[in-house]
């Protein structure tokens, strides 16, 4: 046989689908790869039989339901897309929610990927030293500061008491940021870095431990020498 890569993939899909049918026949509930392979195989066979795209879109959501699959599989498969060869060419069949609700009640358990958190409010940076200060952007372009940037070393055009900000970052959720437009004055709350206190990189002012007084003095001297406002 001289098979193209697409035809080889089709045989792999068929093998997975046959395994799914065998396990389903034993009464086993299918996992994500098994369910995906079975539905895709049925759609491709329908295309080979000459059925239309519209017909197969509807058919794709009748093959399996939540009674046939493991808990959470339906949530992992909100959309299934498979490219089939039809009498008038190759077309993409898109089936939304291919696994519809069955008759059995769904198990009350976490959904794959669900974030579980306590019922109470989450305390951010609880117990660490904090400081509140006012800073103004004296530059002519916006300055955006990420949650864990060493605030002492931010853009030199930002004017604020830098010594107060040594060893601290913005007290905001990780991955968020605060933006200062040109001329904007705003109040921010800072919190001390956790861990060992070793700070390296950023603007190259610190490169040491925030708990070391000598490191702080040297960082302030570098900031003044490089004309960081507020130093």
From Swiss-Prot:
EC identifiers of the protein: 3.5.1.5
GO BP annotations listed: urea catabolic process
Pathways per UniProt: Nitrogen metabolism; urea degradation; CO(2) and NH(3) from urea (urease route): step 1/1
Protein's cellular compartments: Cytoplasm
GO CC field: urease complex
Major localisation: cytoplasm
GO MF, one annotated term: urease activity
InterPro entries: Urease_beta-like, Urease_betasu_sf, Urease_gamma-beta_su, Urease_gamma/gamma-beta_su, Urease_gamma_sf, Urease_subunit
Location of region: Urease beta: 102-231
Cited SUPFAM superfamilies: Urease, beta-subunit, Urease, gamma-subunit
Catalytic activity: urea + 2 H2O + H(+) = hydrogencarbonate + 2 NH4(+)
Sequence segments annotated as region (Urease gamma): 1-101
Keywords: Cytoplasm, Hydrolase
HAMAP family linked: Urease_beta (MF_01954), Urease_beta_gamma (MF_01955)
Similarity annotation: In the N-terminal section; belongs to the urease gamma subunit family. In the C-terminal section; belongs to the urease beta subunit family.
Quaternary organization: Heterohexamer of 3 UreC (alpha) and 3 UreAB (gamma/beta) subunits.
This protein's name: Urease subunit gamma/beta
Organism (species): Pseudomonas syringae pv. tomato (strain ATCC BAA-871 / DC3000)
